[in-house]
Regions:
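Glycine-rich FAD pyrophosphate-binding loop
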Residues: 25-45
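Helical element adjacent to the flavin cofactor pocket in flavoenzyme catalytic cores
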Residues: 160, 185-239, 244-246
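Rossmann-like flavin
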Residues: 91-209
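C-terminal lid/capping helical subdomain adjacent to the catalytic/cofactor pocket in oxidative enzymes
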Residues: 362-396
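N-terminal Rossmann-like FAD-binding beta1-loop-alpha1 element of flavoenzymes
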Residues: 5-32
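Active-site substrate-recognition segment that forms the wall
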Residues: 48-49, 54, 58-98, 251-369
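Glycine-rich phosphate/pyrophosphate-binding beta-alpha loops
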Residues: 47, 195, 299, 317-319, ...
Length: 396
């Protein structure tokens, strides 16, 4: 038997780590290259939801109308930032509108639900096979609606995708008592029992440790540049490798670089959409809801992890490569906690990251310029990650 195939993965977030896991199981020699190490950007403090119930793509006429309405509201769920313009932003927005005009919502949502359901099954198997702990909480997800129009639309969505067996049903009973939330303003809700939450950063770190012990696997803290040009994945380390060097050294190269995939491969229409999160720990999280929440109108998610940690995340900001944590984007998350839970918490940590989004909301799993790509899953990267990693491993 010959030497195992050697594979370089660029990016050590959840896409890179899960891809490495499936490749390692097949006996490949896997080397991850990331300037910051494992899970230090979008896989550091996301909303935590493994949410089949949230697998709808955004390409609808109603979302375009909301986006226009929110243009002048700095604290709106979507901040378009009309003061920031670039060719990549124009191209992405045009692609989003184009995907909406082609009425791809139904077809693409079915695809993301399929990926999400497959990923759920694979995650359960990984947990059983590896025994890693990532503060997973099998609490389900409560999807709440606060106006009649959005609730009527949600009930139609339940019927529309019922055949997918995604497990999302109308929630019954006293929501405040059942889930420990303030429910006065809730018009209707759905519950998805099979959904869960987990700390993505802990998952990536612990799975990386597992692979170091069980696979031919290593992580290198390298910046990656294009043909000697200074186009880096953002990073703290000085050592740099070119994509050409990786292609010459390894049998295959896989780009799992999140939003930075479009820096390394400019032909791909992947845009960095900034999301924010706040995290409460210890006593600050004692009165958190019993289940994970998805507030449809506010576009905010909230997750109680199994280590007395409560994470609230959401909002989308189109501001190119700006990493600033803006107070006017954090405030809606804090206000949501005070308005919707029984928590009286004031101490929290903040985070923001650039999520890799394609215009049609579908991830890119393909070969581009002689390299494989696993990127573009955006806010569903954690939810669909296992299935996407399995798919690209099979394709290779």
């Amino acid at each position: 038997m010959g030497n195992p195939k050697s594979i370089a993965i660029v990016g050590a977030g959840v896409a890179g780590i899960t891809t490495a896991y499936f490749l390692g199981k097949k006996g490949y020699k896997v080397r991850l290259h990331d300037p910051n190490g494992v899970a230090e950007e979008c896989s550091y403090a996301n909303g935590g939801q493994l949410s089949v119930c949230n697998a709808e793509v955004w390409n609808t006429y109603s979302n375009i109308a909301k986006g226009i309405k929110w243009l002048t509201q700095p604290d709106a769920p979507l901040a378009f930032r009309p003061d920031v313009w670039s060719w990549s932003k124009i191209k992405w927005v045009a692609g989003f509108i184009g995907a909406t005009l082609t009425n791809s919502y139904d077809r693409n949502t079915r695809k993301t639900i399929e990926y999400s359901l497959r990923s759920r099954r694979l995650m359960k198997k990984l947990m059983k096979d590896t025994g890693i702990d990532f503060h997973h909480n099998d609490c389900g997800i409560l999807h709440i609606y606060k106006n009649q129009k959005s609730w009527d639309k949600a009930r139609k969505t339940l019927d529309r995708f019922k055949d997918t067996k995604w497990g999302r049903v109308e929630a019954k009973g006293n929501l405040a008592k059942k889930y420990n939330i303030y429910s006065k303003d809730i018009v209707g809700a759905t519950f998805t029992k099979g959904d869960s939450v987990g700390d993505i950063h802990t998952f990536c770190r612990h799975l990386s440790y597992y692979m170091e012990d069980n696979f031919d696997y290593k992580v290198y803290c390298n910046k990656i540049v294009i043909n000697k040009e200074v186009k880096y994945l953002s990073g703290k380390r000085d050592h740099a490798r070119t994509l050409q060097e990786l292609k010459e050294q390894y049998d295959e190269v896989i780009i799992c670089a999140g939003a930075y995939t479009s820096v390394l491969l400019p032909s791909l229409n992947i845009y960095p959409i900034k999301g924010y999160s706040i995290t409460f720990k210890g006593a600050e999280a004692e009165d958190a809801p019993f289940t994970s929440i998805l507030d449809d109108d506010a576009k905010i998610v909230a997750s109680p992890f199994n280590n007395l940690t409560f994470r609230v995340a959401g909002t989308a900001e189109l501001a190119d490569w700006n990493h600033d944590i803006r107070e006017d984007r954090i405030k809606p998350l804090v206000d949501w906690v005070h308005d919707n839970t029984f928590m009286d918490a004031e101490k929290y940590t903040r985070w923001a990251c650039l999520r890799p989004m394609t215009p049609n909301m579908l991830p890119i799993i393909s070969k581009v310029q002689g390299m494989w790509v696993n990127s573009g899953a955006g806010h569903l990267g954690w939810t669909m990650g296992m299935a996407l990693a399995e798919k690209i491993t099979k394709d290779i």
